[in-house]
Regions:
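ABC ATP-binding cassette signature C-motif
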Residues: 1-170
Length: 170
C-alpha cells in the first residue's frame, strides 16, 4: 500500500491518470499483468461518473451484469447510500454522495489494483474510518494520493514523495 505525496502541482494526479489510462503517456512503457483489475478513483467525480444518468443506471453500467439488485443495495448501504438513492439523478447528488457512489462502484468491481486520488475528499468521518479499515484489510495493491497525513500513515506501508523533480521513498 503506497502513498504518493508532494506539493500541489508536482504531478501526482497526472501520474495516476496516466496509470489509469485517462491521459496519454508522452514516453516510456507501462505494462500491467493480465489478471490486473484496476480501479481508478478520481478526486473529481465528474470525470468518472455519468452525470446524465441515475445511481442505479451507473451501478448497472459499471458493475458486473450478473450482480443482483440485492447485492447492489447491500453495497450502497455500506457506503451510506440507501435504496432511496437508486432512482436519483447523479447530477443532483452532493460531492460527498458522488464520492460514496464512486467508491461503491470500485467495491462492486472487485478491483485488485486500486489507484485512489484524494479518496477522503468530501467524506464525513464515519466513512473515512470505514474506508481506512477496508483498505488496511484489503489484499488489493494500492497507490494513493492524499493530503490527509493521518489517513496516509494508517493505511500505507510505504510513502513516495515527489519533490523538485526528485523521488524519495520512506
Amino acid at each position: 500500500r503506497v502513498g504518493l505525496v508532494g506539493h500541489n502541482g508536482c504531478g501526482k494526479s497526472t501520474l495516476l491518470k496516466i496509470l489509469a489510462g485517462k491521459l496519454a503517456r508522452t514516453g516510456g512503457r507501462m505494462t500491467m499483468g493480465s489478471t490486473t483489475r484496476m480501479g481508478y478513483y478520481s478526486q473529481n467525480q465528474t470525470e468518472t461518473l455519468d452525470l446524465g444518468g441515475t445511481v442505479l443506471g451507473e451501478l448497472r453500467r459499471l458493475s458486473d451484469p450478473r450482480t443482483s439488485e440485492e447485492e447492489l443495495m447491500s453495497v450502497l448501504g455500506l457506503f451510506m447510500l440507501g435504496q432511496g438513492y437508486f432512482d436519483r439523478d447523479i447530477a443532483t447528488l452532493s460531492g460527498g454522495e458522488r464520492s460514496r457512489l464512486a467508491l461503491a462502484l470500485l467495491f462492486l468491481r472487485r478491483c485488485n489494483f486500486l489507484v485512489l486520488d484524494e479518496p477522503t475528499n468530501h467524506l464525513d468521518l464515519p466513512l473515512i474510518e470505514w474506508l481506512e479499515d477496508y483498505l488496511t484489510r484489503s489484499t488489493a495493491t494500492l497507490l494513493m494520493v492524499t493530503h490527509d497525513r493521518y489517513f496516509l500513515d494508517n493505511v500505507c506501508n510505504e510513502i513516495i514523495e515527489i519533490d523538485d523533480q526528485s523521488v524519495y521513498s520512506y
